[in-house]
Regions:
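Residue-level signal for short segments within beta-strands and strand-turn junctions
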Residues: 72, 88, 151-153
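Residues that cap or initiate secondary-structure elements
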Residues: 47, 74, 109-111, 155
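Core segments of cupin and vicinal oxygen chelate
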Residues: 30-34, 40-85, 119, 135-137
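Bacterial N-terminal signal peptides
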Residues: 7-15
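Short linear motifs in intrinsically disordered
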Residues: 57-60, 104-106, 126-129
Length: 166
């Protein structure tokens, strides 16, 4: 009788926990940021700074900087990538921002996200650029930081053959 009661309590606890987790951990869907796609910042001597990060922090560098490969949480069979890149301090790529950095956010539903932002009075800095490994557009946040939004195509990005940090 004690074993039967214990088994019943364990089953009840399992199903209550499972049911609660299903009700409370719904995946976030819709147009949104899903993660960090890249961290970009200016440097006086990008080549020397890349060499320093490689030598002392063990970061493998490619043409644009370091790529970090990871597996996506909702489907661990899918790869994702985050880029760490240096730009010359004279770059115009971060304009109209005057900041020394720019963050690239990975997004889902870029077109709808842009429509939602436009409805809120937020206009993109440029038009959507589509390339094989995704779509990009830039916006400004209220404090003058330029933000890059990237709807990635990670399958195509992986084919670019970068020496990824894993």
């Amino acid at each position: 009788m004690k074993k039967l009661t214990l088994v019943a309590l364990l089953l009840l606890a399992f199903f209550l926990g499972y049911g609660f987790s299903r009700l409370t951990s719904r995946p976030n869907t819709g147009p949104r940021v899903t993660g960090i796609g890249g961290i970009f910042f200016k440097a006086k001597d990008p080549a020397a700074l890349k060499a320093w990060y490689s030598k002392y922090l063990g970061m493998r560098m490619g043409g644009y900087g370091a790529n970090f490969e990871w597996h996506q949480g909702m489907d661990s069979t899918k790869k994702g990538f985050t880029t760490w890149a240096l730009f010359k301090e004279t770059t115009k790529y971060f304009q109209p921002s005057e900041k020394e950095f720019m963050i690239n956010y990975r997004v889902e539903g870029l077109d709808q996200l842009l429509a939602n932002m436009k409805a809120g009075g937020i206009l993109p800095v440029d038009s959507v650029q589509k390339v094989s490994y995704g779509s990009f557009v830039h916006i400004m946040d209220p404090e003058g930081n330029k933000i890059e939004l990237w709807q990635p195509n990670d399958v195509e990005y992986a084919k670019m053959g970068s020496d990824n940090n894993k």
